[in-house]
Amino acid sequence: MLDIKRIRTDFEAVAEKLATRGVDAAVLNEMKKIDAKRRNILVKVETLKAERNTVSAEIAQAKRNKENTDDKIAAMQNLSAEVKALDAELAEIDAKLTEFTTTLPNIPADSVPVGADEDDNVEVRRWGTPREFDFEPKAHWDLGEDLGILDWERGGKVTGARFLFYKGLGARLERAIYNFMLDEHGKEGYTEVITPYIVNHDSMFGTGQYPKFKEDTFELSDTNFVLIPTAEVPLTNYYRDEILDGKDLPIYFTAMSPSFRSEAGSAGRDTRGLIRLHQFHKVEMVKFAKPEESYEELEKMTANAENILQKLNLPYRVVALSTGDMGFSAAKTYDLEVWIPAQNNYREISSCSNTEDFQARRAQIRYRDEADGKVKLLHTLNGSGLAVGRTVAAILENYQNEDGSVTIPEALRPYMGGAEVIKP
């Protein structure tokens, strides 16, 4: 959520920044008018309340003097009626302002590339060289079916489209990957957490999914509960409505969880395979940091995600997302895109973002600065470390052999009981 004070004092600069995220200037101008009206009403209310207090004191004095107070009582009643009417108008205006402030995206950092969509993202670096095959590489869904480790047909029968069963060494591979990821993040100082997989609406509001993106989630009917779209939600809300000690920052959390997404608006996209599912495992990283340290922490978090891909020897690239492609809550985002041979393309496998104080303001997560004792909003960061299903897809395709088998990356073999190859 944006700081209304910043919008007031730096309106033109904020409007210019948000325009790069597709926010119409007319929306901000309307918000500015409503906010000005609100402040005018507040002045009127305070003036009327002061007058009412004066009249009340005069009534008390008149009664002590045994004077007639009918006119003054009538005047006070009129003042009270005016205050009540203005308070009601103020409540309506506050609701409108809340609608504006809770649906406006975050202000992009100065270093974010300006652009309309993913075509304007900027590549930062690459690691590894895509393998040159001397045979036609198969897509991971064909490999998985041929190896008997991924079953989409029965997933569709039991649940529906975009669901599957992992079997045998496929299930073992999935488990090996997320255990490996959690262990690696633990070495970097992250505290492992097992979170609830169901959260309430306040939690979804805190991280920015609600109210704007309800259609992308799975809600439990007639309840206040939602299946988590990412462990970012429970991890970030862990400290909702709390004041942390500044000397304890930064704080690192990591968690593996299922993620549930309706994929509204994704009809026809990635209809086969592990890239876009309604339910998938993901290892998440979340940080709580002081404002002056948050961008250094973003670089570290991105490096933590890269570490996983490097140890799995999977070629990837890092891109800085443009203003038009960033997520709603992000001030800056790096995407890690892994090489998928059958698509001859890099595909997103991690997204690492600094939301600055955007989520902290919504969730009221603050810290007491040990330097001056003041209570301030901290910065929150989140990143995938990594999406597990997409990692399975990348391993199957990059490590496939001509006979249809798949070599298991060396880093995962201790987690696979020493198995080296998945064979048909």
Swiss-Prot record:
Gene3D superfamilies: Bira Bifunctional Protein, Domain 2 (3.30.930.10), Serine-tRNA synthetase, tRNA binding domain (1.10.287.40). Catalyzes the attachment of serine to tRNA(Ser). Is also able to aminoacylate tRNA(Sec) with serine, to form the misacylated tRNA L-seryl-tRNA(Sec), which will be further converted into selenocysteinyl-tRNA(Sec). Disulfide bonds: none annotated. The gene is serS. GO terms for biological process: selenocysteine biosynthetic process; seryl-tRNA aminoacylation. Keywords: Aminoacyl-tRNA synthetase, ATP-binding, Cytoplasm, Ligase, Nucleotide-binding, Protein biosynthesis. One of its GO terms (molecular function) is transferase activity. ATP binds at R261, S262, E263, E348, I349, S350, S351. PROSITE patterns: AA_TRNA_LIGASE_II (PS50862). This is Serine--tRNA ligase. L-serine binds at T230, A231, E232, E284, S384. PANTHER family: SERINE--TRNA LIGASE (PTHR43697:SF1), SERYL-TRNA SYNTHETASE (PTHR43697). HAMAP family: Ser_tRNA_synth_type1. One of its GO terms (cellular component) is cytoplasm. It comes from the Bacteria. Homodimer. The tRNA molecule binds across the dimer. The keyword Transferase does not apply. It is an enzyme of class 6 (ligase). It catalyses: tRNA(Ser) + L-serine + ATP = L-seryl-tRNA(Ser) + AMP + diphosphate + H(+); tRNA(Sec) + L-serine + ATP = L-seryl-tRNA(Sec) + AMP + diphosphate + H(+). Pathway: Aminoacyl-tRNA biosynthesis; selenocysteinyl-tRNA(Sec) biosynthesis; L-seryl-tRNA(Sec) from L-serine and tRNA(Sec): step 1/1. It comes from Streptococcus pneumoniae (strain Hungary19A-6). CDD domains: SerRS_core. It is found in: Cytoplasm. It holds the Pfam family Seryl_tRNA_N.
